[in-house]
Amino acid sequence: QSSDLAQWNRLKEIFTSKSLQMVSFTITEKGYALQKADGTWFPFVEADIKNGPDKATGAMAVLVAMLYERYPIALVSMDNCSKNGAKLRESVLTMAEEWKKQGFVDDDFITYVSDEKVVAFPWTMIDKITPRPSEQIADDLEALGVEKMQPVITGKKTYIAPFVNAEKPQYLVIEDSFPNGRPALEKGFGVYMADRNTVNLSERMKVTVCLNPVHSATGPLGVV
């Protein structure tokens, strides 16, 4: 947050580096939301709109404030939701437009962030199951000398831990749209670079053929 000047300046230093090619996001689908169900702004979003880039606090406001400082870049949402890049782009453009109304930015900035040849929002599809933290893995890590690895049960009866355990199969399909170049992402295990249509079809296949129908079919058996 911009209330911590040292962190804010460090973030700006990183974001304005010409070598920066991409910024990835895993903030859940709710992290892109600017409005409540009734269409009104969340209070922190309303404050960000009124206060402008120099006092941004929310994730989307901070991102747009950083975009005001820099060069071509790809903003890559890796959250597990359909058309994630479009959701991120909509939030960025909404915040930018609201700042324009307040006089914090001008038309040139809106044109800049709207041009996907300059600021891209690649779509991605992630398919990897991460079940609740395993006590066995926690024990194994502690046996290796890593301290305080045991899962914690929250007040909402969810499990959290300092580690993540997951199934071995994994698929990450990324739209190959990077205005300032990119790392060799395809060298990663289970990572595939593709066009937007392929990413969208992969997402559709995951939720209509490979994953949800199987869960829906086997769920009643578990109840029985």
Which residues fall in each region the model found?
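Substrate/ligand-engaging "lid" and interaction regions
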Residues: Q1-V224
